[in-house]
C-alpha cells in the first residue's frame, strides 16, 4: 500500500510504552513487517497503519515542543475513536496526562489531546470533519459514512499525522504532485496566527498540513540524536531507490550516512520532516 504506512515513536522504557500502546490504546503486535532488521523496533497494528516503537533508552525530545504548533515538523498523531469522552475517561483513569480536555472543535468534531509516556503528542477524535472547502466530495463522503458506522465503544485507530510547514504550495507540490496524495479539503481557523489546515489522503490515513501566516520556528529534528517521541513517518512507495530520486527532484534531501532500513531510505522534505521510504505492500 502506498501512502503513510507508519509513524515512528521513540521510547525510553520500551516495556512501559508497550503497556501504553498495547494494553491502554489496544494496538496489537504486527507480524511479518520486513522494514526493520533491528531488535530495538517493535511494530504494532493500529488500524490502517502501523506504530513503530523504537527503544531509544536515555534520550530527550530534541527541542521539540508539544505546545507550539508554530514549530515546523511533526506535530501530533491522531486516532479516530467512537466517543472521545468515553475514551478520555478511560485514559484519565489510567493516569494519562491531557494537554487539551475533550472539546468541540472547528469542523464539527470532538477531540482531546494527551501525551504518551515520553511526551509524544496524541489526539483522539470522533465524528467526521465538515470542511470549509471540499476538494474531493468522494473522500469527504467516505469519512462521513465511516463515522456513521463506527460504534460508540470503538477504540483508537490510526487516523492522521499532523505537520507544520512553511509554504503550502511547496508542500502540495511534494505530497500531492510527487507522492500522489489526494486533497480532501481545508479548514480555515483564521485568528491572529492565520491558521489553515489542509487535508490530504495518504493511503489509509490522512496527512494534516498546518500552515500559519504568523512566523514559524525551525524544525529541531536531526538524524544523529537519541530522540524520544515522534521520530518520523514511513511512506510506502513502489521502489524506494526510484522514489528518493524523484522526491529529491521535488525538494527532498536524502539523509547522509543512513544505513537503510531493510530496503527503506531516509530523507527529509523541505521542512525537515523525516520520511522513511519503504516498499509498498
Model-derived features: positions:
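Core segments of cupin and vicinal oxygen chelate
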Residues: 2, 8-51, 56-57, 163-206, ...
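Vicinal oxygen chelate
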Residues: 3-12, 41-49, 63-154, 186-189, 198-200, 241-281, ...
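N-terminal beta-strand motif that seeds the catalytic metal site of vicinal oxygen chelate
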Residues: 1-18, 74-79, 127-172, 184-187, ...
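Short loop/beta submotifs within extracellular cysteine-rich repeat domains
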Residues: 28-29, 51-53, 60-62, 124, ...
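Acetyl-CoA-dependent GNAT
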Residues: 56-58, 127, 212-214, 280
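Short, flexible, glycine-rich and Lys/Arg-enriched loop motifs at helix boundaries
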Residues: 187-194, 214-218, 222-224
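A short, acidic/glycine-rich surface segment
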Residues: 38, 59-65, 132, 145-147, ...
